[in-house]
């Protein structure tokens, strides 16, 4: 788990989190530190897959991102991508605190290359990102990922599932934490590639893994969008199946 803004304290002490996930929390303070840790953990491996089209056999080169030295890493968590992108953005500003026009393109390109790399990692990928309201000018709003630059417009293409966090009050007065899984004008990025989940579900990753198993996905890439305090970090506890 990469904790970019000390949100992991929601899950407990460092020792409690290590016991929960099997590894300690990683907390890089700069974008370059994050890249260094990722490069220490993973490597890119090129493999050739043979595919038959009728009587024709085609060689396809595939790039796979795998853990180094046979280390077992079942899941990678980034909390949050909003803060990670800001850490990189801070390295691009000049002495006046502003970015040049070409730097916005550099920001987009770097974040896209990072997303392409980490979404090739096998297993489960969970990325949390803060949300931001956009006024559409007709009295309606939509919720976007809080990422400066244009990455927020198409970030969902990298993921199998994109959920928005919501809270509702139950009849007994308790707060219930749910995920919005279906696309609407307001929840513009929401999606479920299995098309098996209801429009609203409790914030429980085991529900996602059930439909992933049914569809026989080989990996699971999940983006969670929501405001602070809406369950993004707390729900990470459900990555562990306590019944297994």
Locations of regions flagged by a protein language model:
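Conserved inter-motif catalytic segment of the P-loop NTP-binding fold
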Residues: 2-98, 108, 244
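Conserved GTP-binding G-domain of TRAFAC-class P-loop NTPases and closely related GTPase folds
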Residues: 133-217
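Hydrophobic anchor at the beta1->P-loop junction of P-loop NTPases
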Residues: 224
């Amino acid at each position: 788990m990469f904790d970019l803004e000390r949100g992991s304290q929601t899950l407990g002490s460092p020792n409690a989190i290590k016991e929960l996930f099997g590894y300690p929390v990683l907390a890089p303070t700069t974008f370059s530190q994050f890249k260094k840790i990722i490069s220490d953990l993973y490597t890119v491996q090129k493999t050739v897959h043979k595919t038959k089209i009728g009587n024709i056999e085609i060689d396809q080169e595939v790039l796979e991102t795998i853990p180094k030295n046979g280390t077992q890493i079942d899941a990678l968590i980034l909390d949050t991508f909003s803060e990670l992108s800001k850490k990189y953005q801070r390295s691009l500003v000049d002495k006046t605190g502003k970015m040049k026009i070409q730097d916005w393109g550099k920001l987009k390109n770097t974040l896209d290359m990072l997303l392409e790399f980490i979404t090739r990692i096998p297993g489960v990928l969970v990325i949390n990102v803060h949300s931001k309201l956009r006024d559409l000018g007709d009295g309606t709003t939509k919720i976007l990922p809080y990422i400066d630059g244009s990455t927020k417009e198409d970030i969902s293409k990298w993921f199998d599932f994109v959920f928005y966090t919501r809270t509702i009050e139950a009849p007994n007065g308790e707060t219930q934490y749910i995920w919005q899984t279906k696309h609407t004008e307001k929840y513009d990025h929401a999606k479920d590639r299995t098309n098996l989940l209801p429009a609203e579900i409790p914030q429980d990753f085991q529900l996602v893994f059930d439909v992933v198993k049914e569809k026989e996905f080989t990996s699971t890439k999940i983006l969670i969008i929501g405001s602070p305090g809406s369950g993004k970090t707390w729900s990470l506890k459900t990555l562990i199946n306590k019944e297994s």
